[in-house]
Amino acid sequence: MKKILLLLFCMMAMTVQAQEWPASSIQTYAGTRWWWMGSAVEEKELSELMKEYSSHGIRTLEITPIYGVKGNEVNNISFLSPRWMEILKYVEELGVRNQMQIDMNCGTGWPFGGPEVPLEEATCRVMYRVDTVQVLKQMSLDLTPDNRLKVASTTEEDGENVLQTALLQRVMAYRLDTPADTQDLTSLVQDNLLTWEPKIKEGSTWQIFSVYQARTKQRVNRAAPGGEGWVIDHFDAKAVKHYLDRFDKAFAENCTPYPDTFFNDSYEVYGADWTPGIFAEFAKRRGYKLEEHLPELFLNEGEDPTQVLIDYRETLSDLLLENFTKQWTEWAHSHNVKTRNQAHGSPANLIDHYAAVDIPEVEGFGLSDFGIKGLRTDADKVRPNYSDLSMLKYASSAAHITGKPLTSCESFTWLTEHFRTSLSQLKPDLDLIFCAGVNRVYFHGTAYSPTNDPWPGWKFYATIDMSPTNSIWRDAAKFTDYVNNCQRFLQWGEPDNDFLVYLPVRDMWARRTSDLLMMFEISNMYKNAPEFIRDVLLIDSLGYDCDYISDSYLLGTTYQEGKLKTAAGISYKALIIPGEVRMTSQLKAHLDRLKAQGAPILYRIDNAEMNRLAKPEELKTVCGLHMIRRSNPTGYHYFISNLTPNDVDQYVALGVDFLDAMLFNPLNDRVHYTVEKRDGKVRIRLRSGESIILQTFNMSVPNAGKQPVLDYAVTKDLTTGAWTLSFEESAPAVKPTFKLPKVQTWETLGDDSVKVTMGTGVYSCRFTLTTREMANHWAIDLGDVRESARVFVNGKYIGTAWSVPFVLKLSNLKVGNNDLRIEVTNLPANRISEMDRRGVPWRKFENINVVDIHYEHTTYEHWEPVPSGLNSTVKLVRLQ
């Protein structure tokens, strides 16, 4: 009897616990890239700013030093100097005090490099020349580097500057007539002069390839003081170790604790298609000599130029993985530090490189256009989002197949022009990031700015500016609450995607491009992998989800208990090979063994066969919603977002079995509801732009009440009437109080100051409710809000509307008169454009200073006024 009671007690406890929100932690809160301009930071300012960041829901700071502020050179602090290390130690102490995690870029700007990198360890490129000669007797050929040298990949730095670094590596002769012959003439070169007498006495025609290694002379981009210098050769183990030695020395000599995580930004090492040891490394890894196949590599000629190209690109991938990514991570681990890495851009198998670190990180770059109803648009002042679902899934796939708990994302890079990004514009792309498997968001980003610096303060050019100097900061805490609430669920449990999809990287490498180097940059994936992108998006549209897998991790995958299991123990229902793809004989043999054991392996996207193996999610196929599913000890949980122009109210079948289900509203962690069920289906109601968390249970759970529904058949229009508009926070200050016959945006009013102000306008009105009307529950629909709004009823704070639809559930209503107060905060666009019209010199930064979304230097005086305030209607809507 006691055992039965104990079992019942445990089941009841599990049921109660299952209905609760997962706990928050530092990692469930948002992080941000913290730009230190010139590293000109100061203790008192740091203390105040870190309190402010923490109170607004930013709990991880990734320090990235960059170029400084003009005229402030005296306050710059050299990277890794004793003073810099002292400041880092202080920041780490403040982090503990403010419950914050401190990360650190393993360099300044990007990529890795700096003053201690000698030219012989800097980025390397190949240059070559081809001479066709007819040899009758002894011949001489002057091979001194000159303008006849060709490059195989483009860089930012070409011409004489690079030619001066060219060193002859190999001279190979290929006989063009019969019999074919290849000879290595390198040893016959003295002081760049080739002297050769072929053993074949009769005249013969030869193609002579002279291969040079040169340095690209790329310098660290956006470097901070103390970080200027050459970019390292990432393929060279010695160069990487030498670079990391500088950090060992700085931390040891200054007794500074290491940060929680070291970070590496996206691979932006341009034209670095070579390394001094490549010939030996190629022969060791590929089993033949690259120098014997130079016509295939450089001219696309010969017996099998495609295979040589693939092998060359795979060798670079191997060297980058072993000599840079793994060495860097092993070094960090020796100091009990984690690594977070953006592999995109690498000339490499992205899955292997993302998987080699502790936290794979992808990047959201640009603004998606989902057509969401009511979402503000800024047609000519946004960048299109190159980071579609297929791109975002590289990092999460690597984390999933290796059992790593976190996938991070550099979020909101270059969404819009400066000063024009609203909180409402962030949510759709954030939801897309979450649906791709990301569960650790870092904002891009936050610039340290002294509190006494005149507005707009210190700015970094490509960021949304999530900082106290931006007007969106006033309501940003509600946005970061949303991030935290979503990540509490998304970091809980394990991934539960249906299929593994083989990444056909050799087919990508086989594509002959204008550059020998193939960099998998976000903006070029549509060129490098169009077929793979098409297949991934097709799988998604059929109602399934997948993770990508590479050769190395597929070779470690087994078939157990009817499931494919990666070496980390993550299970999948089947493997999809996307068509006729190139793969090694070793991998083919492994797949044959798996298939013989009964493992389902699909050699094309076969919807009927996929349907037999997994249940498609009608959330996708019927409703067109975005979603991701994870498993947990009592069932499953979904993050679901309506990134469509349509409102959804639909009963749908789920892809998993369940007994009960609940809904959690990530906009408010105090709210959850019992799901309506019918015939084994669940009811999903989401307006355009909304998101929800659905949790299923393998047991019954107590009823938590129904999800309230807006009934637009019963409304009370407050748009017209006796409104007042005043300003409590504004710059420039707006002193008048305006009486309005109906709600309208304030830049349309006649007052000069209100047209250009940045701040918070307070709309106030009084409305009445009858006893009959009070019998209803009400919500308020604020229509088109520019840009966020806090709502108060009869003096009580109701909530903040910062995302579409701008609707809040009301409380504290009463029969008779009710006082409504709506505090609307706008963007800084009107203020900054007015400053440019007056010629205020706020662009004061070194290096690139401030550029627009097209990387051009421009000013904003031509901007038309941006709507600010309530831009349409205000209605009470009955809740059912």
Give residue spans per PLM region.
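Aromatic-lined ligand-binding clefts that engage carbohydrates, nucleic acids, or primary amines
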Residues: 653, 767-794, 801, 820-824
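Extended acidic/polar, glycine-enriched regions
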Residues: 160-165, 169-252, 678-711, 817
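Bacterial Sec-dependent N-terminal signal peptides
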Residues: 1-20
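An acidic-aromatic loop/edge-strand motif
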Residues: 112-119, 130-141, 145-181, 607-611, ...
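Acidic/aromatic-lined carbohydrate-recognition and catalytic surfaces
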Residues: 66-187, 200, 208-212, 220-221, ...
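Short aromatic-centered micro-motifs
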Residues: 173, 564, 620-621, 789-795
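Carbohydrate-binding surfaces of carbohydrate-active enzymes
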Residues: 30-31, 42, 47, 60, ...
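Mature N-terminal segment immediately following signal peptide/propeptide cleavage
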Residues: 19-60
